[in-house]
Regions:
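Glycine-/small-residue-enriched transmembrane alpha-helix faces in small-molecule transporters
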Residues: 1-39, 78, 86, 148-175
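C-terminal-most transmembrane helix of multi-pass membrane proteins
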Residues: 2, 43, 245-289
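Membrane-interface interhelical linkers
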Residues: 1-18, 46-75, 121-127, 145-154, ...
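Specific alpha-helical transmembrane segments that line the substrate/conduction pathway
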Residues: 37-39, 43-48, 88-119, 238-256
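Loop-to-transmembrane alpha-helix entry segments
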Residues: 67, 100-103, 119-139, 149-156, ...
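Helix-helix packing/entry segments at the starts of transmembrane helices
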Residues: 11, 99-105, 173-191, 221-257
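Hydrophobic/small/kink-forming positions within alpha-helical transmembrane segments
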Residues: 21, 77, 81, 85, ...
């Protein structure tokens, strides 16, 4: 762990974002597991690696770390668990490109929630970014209405739970800056696994699918979230926001190359507008986040 911490923060965030970008092709590669079974096993393995990380980091204070995080930590974990569930649902029912581009709207929801709950003003740059971002979203949803099934369109709608849940988590962190939110990731993993268990019907899946769930939980989101958490500690928020766009760029490209999922030009256009709005806000907006 000390060796990892010696790596520059931006590099850790970038590697973490690259890990997250594999989520789409992993979910699409399951053979027989339904989405709730995928959710259960993915979060089960995620909870294991977070537990190992917490044991290495906190040692004898492992259980105390949960107590210290208190209600804010639980609320943060609950919010993140809904995001985890929405991610699997969206990737299972709609395209990787749509899901990844919708995830990038987190900044829009973050600015909006910050205005209402943190009393942080929305400046002109942020307002322009929000308008641009929502324009991109409307293009993606409009495209979905014309060329996708009702199930795929529902996947796009559910996908919005992800950026909203992540924005809620950040707002909780901002409201309680002294509370360690790392234990909240374990809480999120367990709660999401419970959601999957309830709706899965049965949890037995093939060895092939179990291996994919292991890759998703242990490496894709496990290493991804841990590296981003460590890297964010020494990386300016604006740079983190830009580096996190790696997931939205690599995700659709990986789906294109490995599973031949080619996004329509309208989706690419809408996604490009969303990414531009985030870059615009990151470089020219107030560094509230």
């Amino acid at each position: 762990m000390n060796t990892i911490k010696k790596i520059p923060g931006p590099v850790l965030v970038f590697i973490g974002a690259v890990c997250l970008s594999f989520g789409g092709i992993i979910v699409k590669s399951f053979e027989g597991a339904n989405l709730w079974q995928i959710l259960f096993w993915r979060q089960f393995f995620f909870a294991i690696i977070v537990t190992l990380y917490l044991l290495i980091t906190y040692k004898k204070s492992f259980f105390k770390s949960f107590y210290n995080s208190g209600l804010p930590g639980f609320l943060g974990g609950l919010s993140l668990s809904l995001g985890f569930a929405a991610y699997v649902f969206a990737m299972y029912t709609t395209t990787v490109a749509n899901t990844n581009f919708i995830i990038t709207t987190e900044t829009i929801f973050l600015a909006t929630l910050g205005y209402f709950f943190l009393k942080e003003k929305i400046d002109l740059i942020t307002l322009i970014s929000i308008i641009l971002g929502m324009s991109g979203v409307l293009i993606i949803l409009g495209s979905s209405l014309s060329i996708q099934s009702s199930e795929q369109f529902m996947g796009n709608i559910i996908a919005f739970i992800m950026p909203i849940s992540f924005a809620v988590l950040v707002v909780v962190v901002r409201m309680y800056p002294k509370v360690d939110m790392v234990p909240a990731q374990f809480t999120a993993g367990i709660l999401a696994a419970i959601i999957g268990f309830i709706f899965a019907g049965k949890i037995l899946i093939s060895p092939h699918d179990l291996f994919l769930a292991f890759l998703a939980g242990f490496f894709q989101i496990g290493f991804g979230f841990i590296l981003i958490t460590l890297g964010s500690q020494t990386t300016p928020a604006a740079i983190v926001g830009v580096l996190m766009l790696t997931e939205s760029v690599f995700g659709p490209l990986l789906a294109w190359f490995f599973i031949n999922e080619i996004p329509p030009i309208t989706v690419l256009a809408g996604g490009g507008i969303i990414i531009f709005s985030i870059l615009f806000q990151s470089f020219f907006g107030k560094k509230n986040f």
